[in-house]
Amino acid sequence: SQHGIDVEAEVMAALAQEITTEIDQEILGSLGTLAGTAIDTYNQATVSGTATFVGDEHAALAVLINRAANIIASRTRRGAGNWCVVSPFVLTVLQSATTSAFARTTEGTFEAPTNTKFVGTLNSSMRVYVNQYAADNANVIVGYKGPGEMDAASFYCPYIPLMSSGVVLDPSTFEPVVSFMTRYGYVELTNQASSLGNAADYVANIGVNSTNMKFQ
């Protein structure tokens, strides 16, 4: 401990945060794979109609998100998509549509992304999350989570969310080392032999063409 700071505690907290982030990214990657091929691709250059300003073209992305949500409703017969995960780039697109029809149906204000976090609500029903580590052209993942614990696309069940061994000495080098362990189960009900096999019906991907995107 120097200057009133417990270095050991700071390092362990940082490592724990990194492991938590890795788990988040693993789950998001699995959901994106489960969703499969994108059902639509947002391309600003092909938006129809005459836009009065760039935000009108950006608002077209909300239409595609709504379409994906309604497709999920027709697949599952449970409900429309009520959450989505976007990249910081797509979050910027949503932010720039503040004076379009999209903004008038959005509750609250968007926050700057700091991790995979809740940033706003679309159409008073869809919770929007941002994945800070996603690339500009990363798909938008739209999904449905019902009121019950079993009404979802996949299930993350941590037995031990995160456990630390504390600082111990390596018997070979006598260097201080620390170990972390996590135990969890992750399942997607895709096997029709043992379940309905409809996990993929709960999620959908929307592609994003970021190469010709304009913000002014």
Language-model-derived ranges and their functions:
Residues 40-110:
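Extended, solvent-exposed, turn-rich assembly/linker loops in the middle of proteins
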Residues 20, 87-89, 183:
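An acidic- and aromatic-residue-enriched active-site/binding cleft used to recognize and process polar
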Residues 25, 74, 88, 126-128, ...:
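Long, well-ordered alpha/beta core segments of mature domains
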Residues 1-3, 7, 13, 96-216:
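Sequence/fold signature of self-assembling virion shell proteins
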Residues 1-2, 6-67:
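Alpha-helical scaffold segments that mediate packing/assembly in large oligomeric complexes
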Residues 21-26, 72-79, 216:
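Secondary-structure transition/capping motifs at alpha-helix termini
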